[in-house]
Amino acid sequence: MTNNAAAPLYSLRGLPLIGWRDMSHALNYLFADGQLKQGTLVAINAEKLLTAEDNPEVRALIAAAEFKYADGISVVRSIRKKFPQAQVSRVAGADLWEALMARAGKEGTPVFFVGGKPEVLAQTEAKLRTQWNVNIVGSQDGYFTPEQRQALFARIHASGAKIVTVAMGSPKQELLMRDCREVHPHALYMGVGGTYDVFTGHVKRAPKIWQNLGLEWLYRLLSQPKRITRQMRLLRYLRWHYTGDL
């Protein structure tokens, strides 16, 4: 196994997080020696760590996921503070999803999509086929009942999908991925939140300069002032960070 196919783990609040150096390292890790890994990818930011701290069910879902990675700049900075020798960079979930789709298109990996509004999902599929020739073997928008879940899992299993991405928000997407894996275990699952909306232009992401400065959170706050209540929760995370309680 090549060095790029391995990655160190760094513990924050008792959760082991993968430390990728950059996007290339992430892709080489997930496609180690040409073999796509199986398991669940979960993006970890400060807000998700706070939720995991307060909600035992969410913590159990996150802890059970094989591939927890640093999606938020706050988490990256905390890893660097706690582990000064760590060579870890932020790998944003939306960027990782696009890179994963590009690689899947190149290799013909079968992909199944779950979640999103019907029109957004249709636009996502069309763009992925045009842009990277992604082998889409099935999809289901986010409008289905609990009674329809088992039928959906059966469809996913019958499709032979090797990648399943779920855009339902947390913790709904983590719950669905956990349950689907009982029916279709041999795949890589990824919770992607609002990524389909961003990919199709329905939601505007922060400009690159804001992302590069680690200020994407501030851009979202300025664009959506109603997020202030959620952002205030992060003061608790800052206390953890600056007191070394991570």
From Swiss-Prot:
Query: What is catalyzed by this enzyme?
Result: UDP-N-acetyl-alpha-D-mannosaminouronate + N-acetyl-alpha-D-glucosaminyl-di-trans,octa-cis-undecaprenyl diphosphate = beta-D-ManNAcA-(1->4)-alpha-D-GlcNAc-di-trans,octa-cis-undecaprenyl diphosphate + UDP + H(+)
Q: Which Pfam families match?
A: Glyco_tran_WecG
Ordered alphabetically, the record's keywords are: Glycosyltransferase, Transferase
Origin superkingdom: Bacteria
* Protein's pathway: Bacterial outer membrane biogenesis; enterobacterial common antigen biosynthesis
What enzyme category does the UniProt record give?
transferase
Which HAMAP family does the UniProt record give?
Answer: WecG_RffM
Question: Member of which family?
Answer: Belongs to the glycosyltransferase 26 family.
Instruction: Relate the protein's function as given in its record.
Output: Catalyzes the synthesis of Und-PP-GlcNAc-ManNAcA (Lipid II), the second lipid-linked intermediate involved in enterobacterial common antigen (ECA) synthesis.
Q: What is this protein called?
A: UDP-N-acetyl-D-mannosaminuronic acid transferase
Record the organism.
Answer: Salmonella typhi
Could you read off the lineage of the organism from its UniProt record? Bacteria, Pseudomonadati, Pseudomonadota, Gammaproteobacteria, Enterobacterales
